[in-house]
From Swiss-Prot:
Monomer. InterPro entries: Adenyl_kin_sub, Adenylat/UMP-CMP_kin, Adenylat_kinase_CS, Adenylate_kinase_lid-dom, P-loop_NTPase. Residues 126-163 are annotated as: LID. Keywords: ATP-binding, Cytoplasm, Kinase, Metal-binding, Nucleotide biosynthesis, Nucleotide-binding, Transferase, Zinc. Pathway: Purine metabolism; AMP biosynthesis via salvage pathway; AMP from ADP: step 1/1. It is an enzyme of class 2 (transferase). The keyword Transferase applies. Residues 30-59 are annotated as: NMP. Belongs to the adenylate kinase family. It comes from Oceanobacillus iheyensis (strain DSM 14371 / CIP 107618 / JCM 11309 / KCTC 3954 / HTE831). This is Adenylate kinase. One of its GO terms (cellular component) is cytoplasm. Consists of three domains, a large central CORE domain and two small peripheral domains, NMPbind and LID, which undergo movements during catalysis. The LID domain closes over the site of phosphoryl transfer upon ATP binding. Assembling and dissambling the active center during each catalytic cycle provides an effective means to prevent ATP hydrolysis. Some bacteria have evolved a zinc-coordinating structure that stabilizes the LID domain.
Amino acid sequence: MNLILMGLPGAGKGTQAAKINEKYNIPHISTGDMFRLAIKEGTELGKKAKEFMDQGDLVPDEVTVGIVKERLAMDDCANGFLLDGFPRTTRQAEELQNLLSDLGKSIDYVIHVDVPEEKLVERLTGRRICPTCGTAYHVVYNPPKEEGICDKDGSQLIQRDDDQPETVKNRLAVNIEQTQPLLDFYQDKGYLVKVNGDRDINVVFQDIESILEKK
């Protein structure tokens, strides 16, 4: 089963990826993990990626696609994979189609965990972090016992700059602009399935299971 998981920040994509990985035993492959592995193993492409990353530059498509191809050719992907964070553009999506064809593979589903923008803003702006131990809370979904205070060590909880309302709205706007052409691409190919992510995480996963059981 070869899957791509898509969703905006705060949609709960990471949670669903972990559940898919656990139930179906297919590797959850994120772009960051792929880069780290290639750099750690000292592959030619890993060295090239490191050069760009060390300079704070974006890694070019040809290097990224090469690293993806190396990763998908590994033994643990023989029975499937779950891609997360790649592709990010329609050009990368086209390159992925080509490299999968070279490997004798194809995509089964592109699962889009869809959550209304206002809900994403609520989820992201409600996050609070303990600066001492790193424990994460949410003012609505996972509040501390005492408002604004960490349950574990009594530290004053903080809101990260990234989670300020204006920053969150800007980040979502950029992501929506980048993601829509990709969703259209996979819709046209017949791979795209949308799952309503604005529900309990177990209910969302049941929907994903019902899609995957059809395969």
